[in-house]
Regions:
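Beta->alpha loop/short-helix hinge microenvironment recognizer with preference
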Residues: 1-278
Length: 278
């Protein structure tokens, strides 16, 4: 990390440096601790303060589990569906621009939730949605996409529950595509709009059926399981320690699941590339 930080310090966001420092200091007695003394035998035990950071695999695991439990208790015990909204690969670099990143990434969540809620409103139903943003894929590549947990039904104007278990995928995909392309242009300067226009046009032409939206008919697992899956990416770092197979000081080898082929694969990167991906 020291070499990486020294080499790319101007490009590393302050929040990243802060999280890494918290993680490296986590559990260090020199940074502070709680002292427990047994009143009977007077045995003394020091428990170091934890960082509670997202980047820390120890702290983030507990935070992830707690979030899933709290969220599950807050949601109605009705049928839910896990929906994933993705964007064209050629557009990802636009969401990396520091000048627009925050607005564009928040906009992705807002637009995905709006499209689903508008669909149910047309059927006179107020549905419930939990939206979370994920900015990376299983290979640690930058891949902003939105995960949503949506009720399969909702409340009518008179407060009664009405089931509705149907999604018109063709419509959702085109609506989502149009929403993303408009979202990208919204905050950009005229110069930046002209620069990214070829990317927008290519993404539109390449995806004649719209951007990919994945929503299994019904989840085969419980609502809590869906939330646990989502929270792993929202409350934890990009990769779990058990996926790292090898580190020799120079290279990192880790395992990932290829959803296209439904198989586990291995990827090898230099230590510098790995830190940069994180």
């Amino acid at each position: 990390w020291e070499k990486f930080n020294q080499r790319y310090t101007r490009r590393i966001r302050s929040v990243v440096k802060r999280e890494v420092k918290k993680f490296r200091d986590c559990g260090d007695l020199k940074k502070g601790y709680r002292l427990f003394v047994c009143e009977g035998c007077h045995d003394v035990k020091k428990v170091a303060f934890r960082c509670k950071g997202k980047f820390c695999p120890t702290c983030a695991t507990g935070e992830s589990q707690r979030w899933a439990e709290v969220a599950a208790n807050d949601l109605f015990t009705v049928t839910h569906r896990h929906v994933i909204f993705t964007i064209d690969e050629g557009l990802r670099e636009i969401f990396l621009k520091e000048k627009y990143r925050k607005e564009l990434l928040k906009g992705l969540m807002d637009e995905a939730a709006r499209i689903l809620l508008d669909f149910f409103r047309k059927h006179h139903i107020q549905a419930g949605v939990v939206a979370t943003l994920h900015t990376f894929g299983s290979q640690l590549e930058y891949n902003p996409h939105v995960h949503l947990v949506v009720t399969m039904g909702g409340l009518t104007k008179d407060g009664k529950w009405k089931d509705y278990d149907y999604f018109p995928f063709a419509m959702l995909r085109k609506y989502w595509q149009n929403a993303v392309l408009k979202l990208i242009r919204r905050p950009l300067s005229q110069w930046d709009k002209a620069r990214v226009q070829p990317l927008l046009q290519a993404a539109y032409t390449k995806n004649a059926e719209g951007f990919y939206v994945h929503a299994p008919k019904r989840s085969r697992t419980s609502l809590k399981k869906i939330l646990e899956y989502i929270s792993r990416y929202m409350k934890r770092g990009p990769i779990a320690l058990n996926r790292i197979l090898l580190y020799d000081g120079k290279i990192v080898m880790f395992q990932y699941h290829d959803k296209r082929t439904n198989t586990d694969k291995i990827k090898t990167m230099s230590a510098e590339e790995f830190i940069g991906a994180l």
